[in-house]
Amino acid sequence: MVNTTDFYPVPAAMAYESSVGLPLLGWNVPTEHLDLVHPHWRSFQVPNKYWHFGLAFVYFMLMCMSSLGNGIVLWIYATTKSIRTPSNMFIVNLALFDVLMLLEMPMLVVSSLFYQRPVGWELGCDIYAALGSVAGIGSAINNAAIAFDRYRTISCPIDGRLTQGQVLALIAGTWVWTLPFTLMPLLRIWSRFTAEGFLTTCSFDYLTDDEDTKVFVGCIFAWSYAFPLCLICCFYYRLIGAVREHEKMLRDQAKKMNVKSLQSNADTEAQSAEIRIAKVALTIFFLFLCSWTPYAVVAMIGAFGNRAALTPLSTMIPAVTAKIVSCIDPWVYAINHPRFRAEVQKRMKWLHLGEDARSSKSDTSSTATDRTVGNVSASA
């Protein structure tokens, strides 16, 4: 016999009228699908329905912001030739990862409003978690690629810029990087995807108390969070060191020549534009750090710490913060990247980004950084 609850939502009120008190999480999950819900969650009462409605509203707003922001990034890149530089391909790739994160949001909205459990059971849970896995891991390693690109561009302006072929190879590498820890739980090769928190989201299993789960969580933490984070910190540290060394070299050379500065206004504007773009990349990385660190902490506590500290609410908040970054990324880029900002303002004046000619000119000069700043470096 077909279980009709697989296809039709359970009225939300039923969860709150079934007994005098609130029932436990998993009350509306049939026995054949109960494996989706770890026993840890089944010890908590279902959250008040207003928590579900509130989360649905928050996710709907995030979905709208992400759709508009990432849509603008992809549209401007596709229709503006001057924007289509190798470096900006990394930003477009980041937008694509953010779009994958966007695709799972409608599932959570529907689940929160009508089901209060995983939509589509195992299949729906796998789709939701796989989208989140690719988006999260991909964003992390793509931020590392952006940091590498900024380091090469600013520290080696003559021959350090990545070619289009090199950028495409790195972008392909970011997608390949997402596969191991997405496919292994998806195909049940190692670990699996399960419901978590309010049972309206899914992720890899970090609660099963065995050695296999602990090793998996430790490996995915290193692969998707710690290693990209180390790369990013390394590249930005070296970038800052290179900029300081370059400025020191110019000051020393100017002192020897008894002049105030070796840089012309054009040189200064070109270098300033590249540094502004580096600041944008650093801001996006900081947002990634703030968004994904809480979730990384939850997973590590679940595998190695005191699981009693993990309540449904305490795990749903990090799940929300992990989605926020996909909404903010494009707006940070649109507001802070000079040429992109000018192009958006030209086409969408109602956004009132306030881009002036000076900023646009400054970024235009950045396309010649390898010539201007490079000449200064060569003169030393």
Curated annotation (Swiss-Prot):
Name of the protein in its database record: Opsin-2
Transmembrane intervals: 52-76, 89-115, 129-148, 167-191, 216-243, 280-303, 312-336
Glycosylation (residues): 3
Residue spans, topological domain Extracellular: 1-51, 116-128, 192-215, 304-311
Entry keyword Coiled coil: no
CDD domains documented for this protein: 7tmA_photoreceptors_insect (cd15079)
Disulfide partners: 125-202
Keyword Glycoprotein attributed: yes
Pfam families in the cross-refs: 7tm_1
Stretches with biased composition (Low complexity): 362-372
UniProt keyword terms in alphabetical order: Chromophore, Disulfide bond, G-protein coupled receptor, Glycoprotein, Membrane, Phosphoprotein, Photoreceptor protein, Receptor, Retinal protein, Sensory transduction, Transducer, Transmembrane, Transmembrane helix, Vision
GO cellular component: membrane
Primary subcellular site in the record, as a coarse category: membrane
One term of GO molecular function: G protein-coupled receptor activity
Posttranslational mods: Phosphorylated on some or all of the serine and threonine residues present in the C-terminal region.
Location(s) in or outside the cell: Membrane
Stretches of the chain forming a coiled coil according to its record: none
Renumbered residue ranges of the record's region Disordered: 358-380
InterPro entries assigned: GPCR_opsins, GPCR_Rhodpsn, GPCR_Rhodpsn_7TM, Opsin, Retinal_BS
Stated family: Belongs to the G-protein coupled receptor 1 family. Opsin subfamily.
GO biological process: phototransduction; visual perception
Lineage: Eukaryota, Metazoa, Ecdysozoa, Arthropoda, Hexapoda
SUPFAM superfamilies in the cross-refs: Family A G protein-coupled receptor-like (SSF81321)
